[in-house]
């Protein structure tokens, strides 16, 4: 596409080339030695659309790729070496005579003649009509007219010779012009681009034995010049032009590349880095994704003539929009070889094993494979195997574009991909012979056998691309190994392949109204279903359908037109009816019509402007497609619209016409609105952008721009309310409003006061000034008539400007004529350039090819600068200023700015456009993102309070109100000022002294509003005391430091009032919105200024300012002392440049939300704003209240409480007010609560009673906090990082309401036992309490020692090993120790220090089993029948009493017994009952377990059938068991929740609930009350003294065990047997109750020494020693035992009047069962002989 570019292609010029066209004689163009005389031509029509057929996907023909598929498309034949050609001896066939050229190295060269004539028409089908001659004669001239499919009617005029190279790319001269730098007979040639869409291509008639050399585009030639093309070739190379067929192996290798010929001198020249881009020849064919590198080939440039440096190589096949050649790109060829003679190479890719990385380009992978391995080879196979349904669709598409065969297999079949690849490898070996190369991309060892055969049996060269974990068996068979990870290490990201969503609408009319909409919708859906239509809406007799693209919509229009829908013939149209677009409303402007909402029109006529023939699209068309049909004014109804192309053309005409109408309407605006400077103009237009309507109601209620300019009642109402409005600034009259209204802007229906304001250097007024340029052009010409601009960014600024300009010139000139290259100045390291191309097509080609092209060390960003975009830059500039002026410090993060812009103006922001506003904004890289900052030249002077939002506080729905700077204001009030002779220019600001006053805001605020009312909304600050005194009484002035507050600060504390600075430097008191605030306004001071969100440096500076001023008396410091005070306070310099400013005052004004500048001149003072003071007081007050035990304080005691909390006296002026009530009233009720108690005002924190569930969740949250902080260095983290860390650690949000809190800090304060919040200045740090830190470091030591050999570590190595293991050092001072041994003392429950020969060694202690201890403690608690709880100390004493051993928690890994019990949260609860002593009790679930244990103790062998459990439990406890009360669904689940107590054995209805062996032991001691007694079971024996003795009920035996006295631990237990009741009838004679299971006898446990279980005792008790107890003796035994129980005396070994046989020592042990699971229990024999049945009643007869 070398449009109109003149190149000197020869070192000589010929005069006959300069002749006029009428003097031109026809010349013959001889192609005689390109074809044999004996060969015949083939018809042209048969191959007309072969190039289209070759675009089919490779997946469909993956296994049968044609051998000559690629050779049909511009085969890139490599240039052979001259010397091998000369060595070959070939029989030549007779050829035509040729003439000689003086420039050739040999004497005989063929000549080609091209004549030029007028009026000649050549039909492609008759180009070759002779069978017997080798000469082709064709005339080329200005009268040429080839049949064309181009849709363009009027291509640009051409001069000189129409580009031969671009118009005949398929003939033998296809590349001669663009490639030859030597055309001795042509002189100068002018290249011209192809305009329009892709033209139909006609194949050159192929000879029978020769491959076709190319295709002809049918294009239009408008002008031309004579030219004679003589090509020179050595005689030794003559035979290479006879036949181009690769099948004729007997013929010498051809040196003709697509019809180009070379002389031997040129072939012997060294290569040059040159490039001729394909877009110059085929401009409208989109280039494929595959970019093959060029090989530089010397081209005939005439003998002794040097070639220019802007060509790279010959034509690249991959850049022509066609499939790459079968045998690769031209670079894979080696000189002296023909493609067929090159060894074949095949690539076999297991893409499931070696996949393309996510988000990376498969094109780049294929390209690298071809570049690395294909040199000197021809591509014979390139296949990858995968399940295309499982693979990424974009990867598959990219592989198809690269002409890679994608073989589909079923992923569910085992080794399906491997089998397919192995089959392909075998086929490759059968087809090709050595030498051949196989490239396998896989790591699967299954290919080892195939690779071995290919290498050793077939002699192939094997290249293996594998991953790191490849097997040695696979690697052994490869000649060359390539690591896949390194091979794809720096792949470029994948560019999005999807086209932007572009929907097309169809409008259907004449639908039946007597049918329901659902039926009509179904009918329409059936009609349009084949075309992918979707019914959007049905309204009355019309409907709207949406289609994905233009073609689908046109097919549906043809199908649906005049179709029958329930008896009605429907009408289908691409555009809505005229009445929908042109609804007029009454207006003061004549001829103004109702315009449909831009949003609706955008929705209804959003057109997909694509090129059917596949021409390139510029990136600029994405945003400009489908702006709608209407502009301001009337819209012409499109008549007989048959296609969307016509609609597009109609749209451009309509916009042009409506622009004229709009200009006429604008001229009708009353002139006084713009001419009279004193008349305020109040327009209530709302800002809206493209695609956003001014009013988002139905189209009948929408108003046009012109209607909003009229004097509507709304406008009048606003004017009446705005009593005190600032007049039109006179400065505006000095500026010219030279803004042109682009068609894009007109069609937006928006008139932004901020965007149209000409005063960009100052803050715009809240009033709306419509400054319109009436001289804007009505007939807008083609925006690209004078060329297309290309914007280039991300340029390497390290390169010199000269080098950059030259590089850009050369790079872009390859794609077309470059008019100029402009470089922007180096600004903030953002160097940008603008390249102007000759026409749009060249610019599009350059953008597509050079985007992300690497120049220097950076990849440039290339975008097309459309005309509309250029003209809207002024609009974007004003919109950007309007947003950034309202931002703190005039800076916003890029993401925040984009969000505000799109929400405010309703359209997408092109970030690249921001870089074009070099005179308005600067974009800096800061932190993790980019910052958009307004340049000082565009900034307005900030008022001390910054800007304000509207009263509703919503910046999303309406534009924030910006403070205007008054152009001029009188320095004093002429009416009330005592010194009325003040002259402005003689006033010295340094003489102004800031007055201090003592005033209550409660009375002062209404007085200030009253003053503003009487002074028409503005009062000069200088005369405010005089005005106040005239209206009210004198101000109570005090000297500085005498308990007063600066008057200027007090005024800003008044809601709705602000102090602005006029341009003459005078401070003026005024209302924020030029009128009194409404009574329902939210506190306006909260809305005055915003924190600099996203600017971390300014945020940090604002915190430093607060911290600095807090330390100053009354929070006031002079400006002159700020720098030294800052340096002294923070021990660092305050460098203004670090924050992006050049002056200190600019930096101070950048934080108006915290800093207020008082006074004028050099004696200005700095203080905190009222907002910052309220926030600071709120924090201090909360800290004070939380320090009180009752979380409240009486107002009278506030001074004392403040002094006690902060160690300083209370001074209300420290917070910028004169009374405590003034600042307390500013705090929301949700933070502080004021209440009246006993005639005293009390300040307290509002509390909400939390539910029990929330309390339980808070306990769980405390454990989560401990877990989270244990993973942090030093068990601490910043407060601000807790929420994201919590979300990342637990995978869920931390919802405060879930725990019953509204603030995170309050939630932390609810868990003081595990977490404490430390305040380090303004930053809060979360850390574990000391106890939790010790636990955490103990856990770390356990982990550390267990990772060491022998679980021990030398003490000297502890700190280094700790740092190595956990990544941070161990800070001993965190644990209040100064040495490692001292820390070990605190961790004595975890580790112990042992002295060894090599030094002190740290070892883990041997912990005892916590499970055994848990069971023992559980039995103790279940046997306790006193209160429902007992103290921890009592539990420890009882344990030591029962088990006769001390309970040391350290032996179990705990510091205290309380911590041990807290580690069993599901078994016991530890609590404090209002005192310091801690108590323990069973949980609700284990209270149920206690009842179950007691119940099972009443049964034989402590077991019961499961189906009888509910009834027995209800009888035993007297209550119905509800499993859901314990969080279980059924009884079985409930019993399974207490595995420490019971277990269920058996199956089906025979399941039995069995008491665990650990729970069967029952203790009784004088100091430990007996449990397990219930009144209604008859299990208690009452004697006449009222004593109670426990007996097991419902059993056939009774056992009473007296506890062993503490002073005689080795004394044997005495067992007394008695009958269960006083009845004289023996229980054995009684019938067995039906509810009891059959009795079973079980012996006492036998000691291990007794090996023989059936052996009788060595000393049996004689019967004479046994005696029968009478009833009286029994009663005495019971009485005596009970007395001993109650008195706590030691039980004697014998009872009175009772002879008890002494028990064997083996019987002193308790009933011990296996402590493990019941499965370990020994099997019971059915027959048990000679055992000690202690449970049976002993009866002597």
From Swiss-Prot:
InterPro entries given in the database record: LOTUS-like (IPR041966), Marf1 (IPR024768), MARF1_LOTUS (IPR045602), MARF1_RRM1 (IPR034189), MARF1_RRM2 (IPR034191), Nucleotide-bd_a/b_plait_sf (IPR012677), NYN (IPR021139), OST-HTH/LOTUS_dom (IPR025605)
Localization, UniProt: Peroxisome
SUPFAM superfamilies: RNA-binding domain, RBD
PROSITE patterns, sorted: HTH_OST, RRM
GO BP terms, alphabetized: meiotic cell cycle; oogenesis; regulation of gene expression
Region Disordered: start-end pairs: 594-636, 659-678, 683-716, 1684-1727
Biased composition (Polar residues): 1684-1700
The entry's keywords: Differentiation, Meiosis, Oogenesis, Peroxisome, Repeat, RNA-binding
Residue ranges occupied by any RRM domain in the UniProt entry: 788-867
Gene Ontology cellular-component annotations: cytoplasm; peroxisome
The protein, known as: Meiosis regulator and mRNA stability factor 1
Organism encoding this protein: Gallus gallus (Chicken)
Gene name tied to this protein: MARF1
């Amino acid at each position: 596409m070398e449009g109109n570019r003149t190149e000197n292609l020869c070192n000589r010029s010929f005069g006959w080339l300069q002749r006029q066209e009428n003097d031109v004689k026809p010349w013959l163009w001889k192609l005689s030695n390109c074809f044999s005389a004996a060969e015949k031509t083939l018809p042209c029509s048969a191959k007309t659309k072969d190039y289209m057929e070759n675009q089919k996907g490779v997946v469909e023909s993956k296994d049968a790729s044609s051998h000559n598929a690629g050779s049909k498309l511009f085969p890139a034949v490599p240039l052979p070496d001259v010397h091998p050609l000369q060595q070959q001896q070939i029989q030549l066939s007779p050829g035509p005579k040729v003439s000689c050229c003086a420039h050739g190295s040999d004497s005989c060269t063929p000549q080609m003649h091209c004549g030029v004539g007028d009026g000649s028409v050549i039909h492609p089908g008759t180009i070759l009509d002779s069978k017997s001659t080798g000469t082709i004669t064709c005339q080329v001239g200005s009268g040429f007219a080839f049949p064309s499919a181009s849709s363009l009617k009027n291509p640009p005029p051409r001069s000189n010779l129409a580009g031969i190279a671009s118009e005949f790319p398929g003939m033998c001269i296809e590349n001669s012009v663009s490639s030859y730098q030597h055309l001795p007979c042509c002189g100068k040639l002018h290249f011209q681009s192809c305009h329009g869409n892709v033209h139909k291509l006609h194949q050159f008639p192929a000879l029978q034995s020769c491959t076709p050399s190319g295709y002809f585009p049918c294009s239009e030639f408008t002008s031309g010049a004579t030219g004679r093309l003589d090509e020179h070739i050595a005689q030794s190379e003559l035979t290479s032009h006879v036949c181009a067929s690769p099948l004729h192996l007997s013929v010498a290798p051809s040196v003709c590349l697509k019809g180009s010929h070379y002389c031997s001198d040129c072939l012997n020249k060294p290569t040059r880095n040159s490039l001729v881009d394909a877009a110059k020849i085929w401009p409208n064919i989109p280039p494929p994704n595959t970019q093959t590198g060029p090989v530089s080939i010397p081209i005939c440039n005439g003998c002794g003539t040097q070639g220019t440096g802007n060509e790279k190589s010959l034509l690249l096949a991959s850049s022509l929009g066609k499939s790459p050649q079968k045998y690769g790109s031209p670079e894979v060829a080696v000189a002296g070889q023909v493609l067929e003679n090159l060894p074949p190479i095949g690539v076999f890719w297991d893409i499931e094993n070696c996949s393309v990385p996510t988000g990376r380009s498969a094109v780049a992978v294929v390209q690298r494979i071809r570049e690395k391995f294909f040199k000197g080879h021809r591509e014979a196979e390139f296949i990858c195997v995968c399940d295309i349904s499982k693979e990424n669709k974009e990867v598959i598409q990219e592989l198809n574009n690269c002409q890679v065969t994608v073989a589909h297999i079923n992923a569910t079949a085992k080794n399906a991909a491997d089998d397919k690849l192995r089959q392909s490898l075998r086929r490759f070996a059968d087809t090709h012979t050595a030498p051949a190369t196989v490239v396998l991309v896989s790591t699967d060892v299954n290919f080892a056998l195939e690779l071995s055969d290919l290498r050793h049996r077939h002699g192939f060269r094997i290249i293996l691309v594998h991953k790191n974990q490849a097997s040695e068996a696979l690697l052994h068979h490869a000649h060359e190994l390539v690591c896949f990870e390194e091979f794809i290490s720096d792949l470029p990201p994948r560019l999005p392949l999807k086209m932007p969503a572009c929907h097309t609408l169809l409008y259907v009319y004449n639908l039946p109204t007597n049918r329901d909409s659902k039926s009509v919708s179904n009918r329409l859906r059936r009609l349009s279903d084949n075309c992918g239509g979707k019914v959007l809406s049905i309204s009355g007799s019309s409907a709207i359908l949406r289609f994905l693209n233009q073609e689908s919509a046109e097919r549906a229009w043809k199908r649906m037109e005049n179709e029958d829908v329930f008896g009605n013939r429907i009408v289908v149209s691409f555009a809505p009816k005229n009445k929908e677009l042109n609804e007029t409303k009454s207006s003061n402007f004549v001829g103004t019509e109702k315009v449909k909402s831009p949003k609706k029109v955008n929705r209804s006529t959003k057109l997909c402007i694509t090129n059917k023939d596949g021409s390139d699209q510029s990136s600029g068309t994405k945003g400009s497609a489908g702006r709608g049909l209407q502009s301001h004014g009337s819209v012409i109804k499109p008549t007989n619209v048959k296609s969307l192309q016509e609609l597009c053309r109609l749209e451009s005409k309509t916009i042009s016409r409506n622009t004229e109408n709009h200009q006429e309407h604008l001229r009708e605006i009353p002139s006084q609105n713009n001419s009279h400077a004193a008349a305020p103009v109040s327009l209530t237009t709302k800002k809206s952008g493209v695609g956003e309507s001014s009013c988002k109601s139905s189209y009948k209620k929408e108003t046009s721009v012109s209607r909003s300019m009229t004097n509507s009642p709304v406008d009048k109402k606003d004017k009446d309310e705005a009593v005190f409005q600032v007049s039109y600034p006179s400065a505006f009259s000095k500026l010219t409003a030279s803004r042109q209204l682009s068609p894009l802007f007109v069609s937006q229906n928006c008139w932004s006061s901020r965007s149209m304001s000409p005063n960009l250097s100052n803050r715009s007024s809240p009033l709306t000034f419509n400054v319109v340029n009436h001289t804007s052009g009505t007939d807008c010409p083609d925006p690209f008539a004078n060329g297309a601009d290309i914007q280039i960014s991300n340029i390497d600024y390290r390169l010199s400007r000269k080098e950059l300009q030259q590089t850009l010139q050369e790079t872009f000139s390859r794609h077309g004529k470059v008019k100029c290259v402009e470089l922007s100045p180096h600004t903030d390291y953002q160097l940008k350039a603008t390249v102007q191309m000759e026409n749009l097509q060249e610019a599009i080609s350059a953008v597509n090819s050079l985007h992300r092209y690497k120049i220097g060390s950076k990849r440039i960003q290339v975008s097309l600068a459309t005309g509309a975009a250029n003209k809207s830059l002024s609009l974007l500039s004003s919109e950007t200023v309007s947003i950034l002026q309202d931002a703190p410090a005039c800076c916003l993060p890029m993401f925040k700015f984009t969000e505000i812009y799109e929400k405010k103006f309703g359209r997408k922001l092109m970030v690249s456009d921001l870089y074009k506003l070099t005179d308005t904004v600067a974009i800096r890289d800061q932190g993790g993102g980019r910052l958009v900052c307004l340049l000082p030249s565009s900034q307005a002077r900030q008022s001390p309070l910054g800007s304000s939002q509207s009263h509703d506080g919503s910046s999303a729905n309406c534009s924030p109100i910006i403070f205007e700077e008054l152009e001029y204001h009188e320095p004093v009030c002429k009416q009330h000022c005592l010194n009325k002779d003040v002259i402005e220019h003689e006033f010295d600001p340094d003489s102004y002294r800031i007055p201090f006053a003592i005033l209550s805001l409660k009375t002062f605020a209404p007085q200030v509003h009253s003053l503003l009312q009487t002074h028409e909304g503005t009062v000069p600050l200088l005369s405010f005391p005089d005005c106040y005194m005239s209206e009210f009484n004198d101000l109570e002035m005090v000297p500085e430091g005498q308990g007063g507050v600066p008057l200027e600060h007090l005024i800003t504390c008044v809601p709705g009032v602000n102090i602005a600075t006029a341009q003459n430097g005078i401070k003026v008191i005024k209302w924020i919105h030029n009128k009194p605030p409404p009574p329902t306004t939210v506190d306006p001071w909260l809305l005055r200024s915003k924190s600099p969100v996203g600017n971390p440096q300014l945020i940090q500076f604002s915190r430093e300012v607060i911290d600095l001023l807090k330390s100053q008396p009354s929070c006031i410091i002079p400006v002159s002392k700020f720098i030294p005070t800052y340096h002294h306070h923070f021990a660092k310099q305050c460098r203004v440049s670090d924050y992006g400013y050049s002056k200190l005052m600019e930096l101070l004004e950048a934080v108006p939300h915290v800093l207020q500048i008082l006074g004028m001149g050099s004696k200005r003072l700095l203080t905190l704003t009222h907002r910052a003071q309220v926030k600071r007081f709120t924090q201090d007050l909360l800290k004070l209240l939380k320090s009180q035990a009752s979380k409240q304080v009486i107002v009278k005691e506030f001074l004392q409480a403040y002094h006690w909390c902060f160690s300083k006296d209370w001074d209300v002026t420290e917070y910028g007010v004169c009374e405590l009530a003034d600042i307390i009233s500013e705090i929301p009720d949700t933070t502080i609560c004021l209440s009246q108690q006993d005639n005293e005002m009390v300040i307290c924190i509002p509390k909400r009673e939390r539910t029990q569930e929330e309390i339980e969740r808070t306990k769980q949250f405390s454990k989560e906090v401990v877990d989270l902080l244990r993973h942090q260095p030093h068990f601490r983290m910043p407060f601000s990082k807790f929420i994201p860390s919590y979300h990342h650690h637990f995978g869920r949000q931390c919802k405060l309401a879930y725990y019953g809190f509204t603030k995170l800090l309050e939630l932390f304060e609810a868990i003081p036992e595990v977490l404490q919040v430390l305040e380090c200045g303004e930053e809060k740090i979360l850390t574990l309490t000391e106890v939790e830190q010790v636990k955490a470091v103990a856990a770390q030591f356990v982990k550390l020692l267990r990772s060491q050999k022998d679980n021990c570590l030398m003490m000297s190595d502890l700190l280094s090993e700790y740092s190595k293991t956990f990544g941070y050092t161990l800070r001993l001072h965190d644990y209040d120790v100064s040495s490692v041994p001292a820390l070990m003392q605190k961790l004595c429950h975890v580790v112990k220090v042992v002295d060894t020969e090599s030094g002190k060694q740290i070892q883990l202690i041997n912990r005892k089993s916590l499970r055994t201890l848990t069971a023992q403690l559980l039995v103790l608690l279940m046997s306790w029948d006193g209160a429902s709880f007992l103290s921890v100390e009592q539990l420890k004493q009882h344990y030591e009493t029962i088990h006769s051993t001390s309970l040391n928690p350290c032996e179990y890994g705990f510091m205290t017994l309380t911590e041990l019990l807290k580690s069993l949260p599901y078994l016991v609860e530890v609590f404090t009952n209002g005192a310091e002593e801690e108590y323990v009790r069973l949980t609700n679930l284990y209270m149920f377990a206690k009842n179950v244990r007691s119940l099972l103790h009443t049964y034989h062998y402590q077991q019961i059938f499961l189906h009888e459990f509910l009834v027995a439990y209800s009888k035993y406890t007297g209550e119905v068991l509800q499993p859901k009360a314990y969080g279980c669904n059924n009884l079985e689940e409930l019993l399974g929740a207490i595995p420490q107590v019971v277990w269920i054995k058996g199956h089906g209805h025979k399941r039995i609930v069995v008491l665990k062996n650990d729970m069967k032991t029952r203790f009784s001691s004088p100091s430990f009350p007996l449990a397990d007694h219930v009144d209604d079971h008859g299990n208690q024996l009452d004697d006449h003294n009222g004593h109670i003795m426990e007996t097991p009920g419902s059993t056939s035996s009774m056992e009473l065990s007296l506890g062993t006295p503490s002073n005689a631990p080795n004394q044997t237990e005495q067992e007394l047997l008695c009958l269960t009741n006083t009845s004289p009838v023996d229980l054995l004679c009684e019938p067995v109750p039906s509810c009891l299971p059959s009795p079973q006898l079980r012996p006492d446990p036998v000691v291990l020494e007794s090996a023989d279980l059936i052996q009788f005792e060595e000393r049996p008790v004689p019967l004479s020693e046994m005696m029968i107890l009478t009833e009286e003796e029994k009663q005495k035994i019971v009485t005596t035992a009970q007395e001993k129980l109650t008195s706590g005396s030691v039980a004697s070994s014998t009872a009175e009047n009772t002879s008890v046989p002494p028990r064997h020592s083996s019987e002193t042990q308790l009933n011990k069962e296996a402590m493990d699971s019941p499965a370990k229990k020994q099997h019971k024999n059915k027959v048990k002989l000679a055992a000690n049945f202690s449970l049976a009643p002993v009866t002597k007869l």
